[in-house]
Amino acid sequence: MKVSIEEMVQVGMHFGHQSRKWNPKMAPFIYTERNGIHIIDLIQTHAYLKQVSQFLTESSAAGKTILFVGTKKQASGLIAKVALQCNSPYVNQRWLGGMLTNWKTIQTSIKKLNEFDYQEKTGGFDLLSKQEAAQARKEKARLQKYLGGMKHMTTIPDVVVIVGQPDELNAVAECRRLGIRSVTILDTDCDPSLADLFVPANDDSVASIQLILTEFLRSILNGQQMFSEKQQRGKKTA
């Protein structure tokens, strides 16, 4: 792992929420309180980040699908950027109820979005009346907004990376219901009992989120490289 504790300090990863807004379950990961703000223990953060990074490498090396989720404004753009860099699906606008637990319905909507994409590329919209074309484009834009990051996903994911737990409790609940492993960045207002693996850290600072997600990306790409090499070896021996 390339991230150092010094880098964590530089991006303010140790700053939690106001002490009155804390979740007592995060007490083991809090170093102290300063001016009414909880300070996260970065020695633990570093250890947990290393553990999660190893897990993501192993998951990618096994060919598992990793879904990124983060709709809060500080995370939304970073979620899309990182997911696209490792060809992973993502949700960064709004979690629609049943995105995982009602997967068949979501699959139908994704299929419709892909059909709209094909129609638009092949001039299919030009064959419609102005009103029909306008309606089709409006529906395509709506589907693209909420499902665009999942349009190449064919099955429910094996792992879900979540940024902003308090805002993504529906996603958390669906993961728990289906037994999908979740990886979460936990600020001092979060609940560690709802995450399978986690990194205690500031989830409100763009710089903090970016540093963690960049490490996640590095780990996933390493795993994907291992998976690709394993497949190539399999072809040679076949």
Swiss-Prot record:
GO terms for molecular function: structural constituent of ribosome. GO terms for biological process: translation. Keywords: Chloroplast, Plastid, Ribonucleoprotein, Ribosomal protein. InterPro entries: Ribosomal_uS2 (IPR001865), Ribosomal_uS2_bac/mit/plastid (IPR005706), Ribosomal_uS2_flav_dom_sf (IPR023591). SUPFAM superfamilies: Ribosomal protein S2 (SSF52313). It is found in: Plastid, Chloroplast. Coiled coil: none annotated. It comes from the Eukaryota. GO terms for cellular component: chloroplast; mitochondrial small ribosomal subunit. The keyword Chloroplast applies. Its main location: plastid. Pfam families: Ribosomal_S2 (PF00318). Belongs to the universal ribosomal protein uS2 family. NCBIfam families: rpsB_bact (TIGR01011). HAMAP family: Ribosomal_uS2_B. This is Small ribosomal subunit protein uS2c.
